[in-house]
Regions:
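N-terminal ligand-binding/catalytic initiation module
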Residues: 1-155, 375, 381, 385-389
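Solvent-exposed alpha-helices and their adjacent loops that cap or buttress functional pockets
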Residues: 12, 55-60, 96-97, 122-124, ...
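Short, ordered loop/turn segments at secondary-structure junctions
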Residues: 69-71, 79, 108-109, 134-137, ...
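Glycine-rich phosphate/diphosphate-binding loop of Rossmann-like nucleotide-binding domains
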Residues: 74, 79-96, 157, 165-262, ...
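General beta-strand structural signal in soluble alpha/beta enzymes
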Residues: 105, 131-134, 155-158, 189, ...
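Adenosine-phosphate binding glycine-rich loop
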Residues: 158, 178, 282-390
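Rossmann-like adenosine-cofactor binding region
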Residues: 232-302, 307-309
Length: 390
């Protein structure tokens, strides 16, 4: 199928993939008076007395803002906020279909960090959470940090944390299959953008001790000149042996490769130098760092990509709907590491021990109960970690 052509036809036909639906009627004088004036003054006054009543008397409790500036849309790059709208509408659709979450696209005509932060902060009272989407690095880190500091609702950059959650879930199961432990393996990553940095932070937080990140220049190590603040933070937390050189240099004897970078970055020759039963997560889209058949011929035991036409797809839709569902159900003030780790464990646990194999380390997006399972784990973690407000 020509997906580009068919999708364009669909978008012309629909003129938008989402819409507002009424939850009550206004078809006679009485129903109109209850839904709007004069009756609506009563809930307004309740919220005036206690702003938290906005979660009980409006749809705020179930509504998320999907925010972009259009600077890093898919693999298209900086195409502008309006051009990013089809993706944001699609994201909102997935929120609803997979998590029952009402989501509103907000495409902001600014690239200024503080302007974006202030805009979202001023609108935050209308929402139960904020999902940042397709904002270029390293600005995305600063925008998320500043919003988390100012907002009392969860702020979550899915390109970072959703990807990291799925990677962790997949890696936990992959390591089970090959009989290795996270704290013992050497992990080499390619790509130091939003996803790459978030993946490493989450892996380190759960006990990964031997991690080396690479970018276009090569291995990132403490003392390498020219590192931006985000990379410097990674340099201080990883690569304790201070390995230097190219990806080809540092991948020798690695147990795990995680790529969120560019097509063809990992070669068959590099895979051959990895440890026995190597795990390769090649998640550049749409063309991975190495194709699964090449990686397996070179000796990889388990290969995962971001594509649906190969086994073990790393697909963010497994995570973000359930994560937000759980956060909203807990009325959480944050989505913290405990909640992300709980989501990863929940996803990993959906593949039973009897079903685990080299070609089956993650559930599928359409498997029954994915969103509900993740949501329950996230809500429980929110309560346990003290960020729940219900």
């Amino acid at each position: 199928m020509d997906y580009a052509k068919k999708s364009l036809e669909l978008h012309y036909q629909l003129k938008g993939k989402i819409e507002i639906a009424s939850r009550t009627k206004a078809n006679d004088r009485q129903s109109l008076s209850l839904a709007y004036t004069p009756g609506v003054a009563a809930p307004c006054l309740e919220i005036q007395k206690d702003v938290n009543k906005s979660y009980e008397l409006t749809r705020r409790w179930n509504t998320v803002a999907v925010v972009t500036d259009g600077t890093a849309v898919l693999g298209l790059g900086d195409i502008g906020p309006e051009a990013g709208m089809p993706v944001m509408e699609g994201k909102c659709l997935l929120f609803k279909e997979f998590g029952g979450v009402d989501a509103i696209p907000l495409c902001i005509r600014s690239k200024d960090v503080d302007e974006i932060v202030n805009t979202v902060y001023l609108l935050a009272g209308s929402f139960g959470g904020v999902n940042l989407e397709d904002i270029s690095a390293p600005r995305c880190f600063e925008i998320e940090r500043k919003l988390k500091e100012r907002c009392d609702i969860p702020v979550f950059h899915d390109d970072q944390h959703g990807t990291a959650v799925i990677m962790l879930a997949g890696l936990m199961n992959a390591l089970k299959v090959v009989g290795k432990r996270l704290e013992d393996v050497k992990i080499v990553t390619s790509g130091a953008g939003a996803a790459g940095i978030a993946i490493i932070k989450l892996l380190v937080s759960v006990g990964a001790g031997n991690v080396v990140m690479t970018d276009r220049t090569g291995a990132i190590f403490n003392g390498r000149p020219g590192l931006n603040p985000a990379k410097q933070e990674i340099a201080e937390a990883t690569n304790r042996a201070c390995e230097k050189g190219t990806l080809a240099d540092v991948i020798k004897d690695a147990d795990v490769f995680i790529g969120v970078s560019a097509p063809g970055v990992l070669t068959s020759d590099m895979v051959r130098t990895m440890a026995h039963d190597a795990i390769v997560f090649a998640c550049a889209n749409p063309t991975p760092e190495i194709f699964p058949d090449e990686a397996k011929r070179a000796g990889a035991a388990i290969v995962s990509t971001g594509r649906s036409d190969y086994p073990n797809q790393i697909n963010n839709v497994l995570a973000f709907p359930g994560i937000f569902r759980g956060a909203l159900d807990a009325r959480a003030s944050d989505i913290n590491d405990e909640m992300k780790i709980a989501a990863a464990h929940a996803l990993a646990g959906m593949v039973g021990e009897d079903k685990l194999s080299c070609d089956n380390i993650l559930p599928q997006a359409f498997d029954e109960g994915v969103g509900e399972t993740v949501a329950a784990a996230v809500k429980a973690a929110a309560i346990k970690s003290g960020v729940a407000r219900i």
